[in-house]
């Protein structure tokens, strides 16, 4: 089942998406937005966790408050994109070049902490 917000973007009804999403957080978690032109979409606060954005056109999009953990931006056009501050450039580059899932600094720290706890408890 396709989510309503996702369906609007896949059908290139960006103006309608922006009207609907203006009063709520757009739910695009785990959405397949491969190849979509999202340049005019208001995604500033969107939930894009786990979204598949391969080859999507994100040029100039403000994602500064978007939830991006687990999203993939492989081969996406990202010139001028404002990414959240908790994603470093290396993480973004790896996702663009190799399709790795994005991890924020916070989620990486939690993963490292969990690994460290396991290692420490095994000693």
Describe the role of every protein-language-model region.
Residues 3-8, 12-123:
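Tandem repeat scaffolds
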């Amino acid at each position: 089942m396709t989510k309503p917000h996702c369906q609007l973007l896949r059908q290139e009804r960006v103006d309608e998406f922006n009207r609907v999403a203006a009063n709520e957080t757009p739910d695009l978690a785990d959405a397949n937005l491969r190849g979509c032109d999202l340049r005019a979409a208001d995604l500033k606060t969107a939930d894009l966790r786990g979204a598949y954005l391969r080859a999507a056109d994100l040029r100039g999009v403000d994602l500064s408050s978007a939830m991006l953990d687990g999203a993939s931006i492989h081969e996406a056009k990202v010139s001028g994109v404002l990414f959240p501050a908790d994603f470093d450039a290396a993480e973004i580059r790896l996702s663009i070049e190799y399709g790795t899932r994005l991890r924020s600094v916070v989620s990486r720290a939690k993963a490292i902490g969990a690994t460290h706890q396991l290692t420490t408890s095994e000693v």
